């Protein structure tokens, strides 16, 4: 009786482990490669460049004006009246402060918009991964950059790239 119970238990364990191993169909996808190959990435970059072009040129002209005033102050500061030099120093300090504030706001806005657009593209890639995985019957899809080695997994990067384009 004991032998029969042991044999039945062992058989059950082997059958369960075999079905678990056979149930998972695994695929690998290289999301960063897809992201780099998308033509939308370049068009979004140009769109953002156009969106921030006005503010960038405004900052550039502010910087040039500020540098000109600083050079004039350095060059002519020793020959100016004390009151004029003091007034110009205060003006330069105020303009430098204003430039710094505007530059920080510009950088934050630019970074935020780039992140928004990148996330939109990544969301489209994620939707394409789900569509390909569902269509081809994969249970698990892993990013290729997150895995050191995979022996028995199909690379679906090309299929996902076709789906996104």
Swiss-Prot record:
UniProt entry keywords in alphabetical sequence: Chaperone, Periplasm, Signal
Region entry Lipopolysaccharide binding, spans: 102-113
CC annotations in GO: cytosol; periplasmic space
Gene3D superfamilies (UniProt xref): Skp domain
Signal sequence range: 1-22
Annotated GO MF terms: unfolded protein binding
Region (Disordered): 70-90
Main location per the UniProt record: periplasm
Subunit relationships: Homotrimer.
The protein, known as: Chaperone protein Skp
Organism: Pectobacterium atrosepticum (strain SCRI 1043 / ATCC BAA-672)
Gene name for this UniProt entry: skp
């Amino acid at each position: 009786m004991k032998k029969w119970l042991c044999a039945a238990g062992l058989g059950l364990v082997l059958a369960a482990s075999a079905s678990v191993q056979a149930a998972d169909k695994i695929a690998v996808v290289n999301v960063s490669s897809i992201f780099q190959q998308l033509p939308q990435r370049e068009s979004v970059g140009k769109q953002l460049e156009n969106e921030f072009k006005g503010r960038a040129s405004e900052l550039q002209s502010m910087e040039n004006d500020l540098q000109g005033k600083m050079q004039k102050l350095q060059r002519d500061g020793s020959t100016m009246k004390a009151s004029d030099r003091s007034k110009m120093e205060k003006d330069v300090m105020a303009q430098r402060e204003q430039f710094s504030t505007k530059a920080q706001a510009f950088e934050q806005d630019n970074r935020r918009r780039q992140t928004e657009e990148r996330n939109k593209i990544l969301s489209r890639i994620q939707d394409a991964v789900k569509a390909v995985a569902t269509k081809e019957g994969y249970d698990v899809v892993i990013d290729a950059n997150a895995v050191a080695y995979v022996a028995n997994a199909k690379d679906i990067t090309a299929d996902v790239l076709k789906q996104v384009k």
